[in-house]
Amino acid sequence: MRITYPSIDKLLSRVDSRYSLSVLAAKRAHELEAGDPPTLDHFKCDKAVGKALEEIAAGKVTVDPAHAEVNLED
């Protein structure tokens, strides 16, 4: 599978490594599947991982390295 949207360059401008990006996207996707409310009103992607990547690209979800947790930005 190839990521075309959001672009990997835009995603990596928000997260410091591909590893951090994949962990962050997976954690956020699990949260969305568990019923957490989305941080965006509209998504281009239907799947949870795609939605998580869109939230990361929009700057709505970030990594907190001190706690290794997903943080939602208002």
From Swiss-Prot:
Pfam families: RNA_pol_Rpb6. One of its GO terms (biological process) is DNA-templated transcription. Its EC number is 2.7.7.6. GO terms for molecular function: DNA binding; DNA-directed RNA polymerase activity. One of its GO terms (cellular component) is DNA-directed RNA polymerase complex. It catalyses: RNA(n) + a ribonucleoside 5'-triphosphate = RNA(n+1) + diphosphate. Keywords: DNA-directed RNA polymerase, Nucleotidyltransferase, Transcription, Transferase. Belongs to the RNA polymerase subunit omega family. The RNAP catalytic core consists of 2 alpha, 1 beta, 1 beta' and 1 omega subunit. When a sigma factor is associated with the core the holoenzyme is formed, which can initiate transcription. PANTHER family: DNA-DIRECTED RNA POLYMERASE SUBUNIT OMEGA (PTHR34476:SF1). Promotes RNA polymerase assembly. Latches the N- and C-terminal regions of the beta' subunit thereby facilitating its interaction with the beta and alpha subunits. HAMAP family: RNApol_bact_RpoZ. This is DNA-directed RNA polymerase subunit omega.
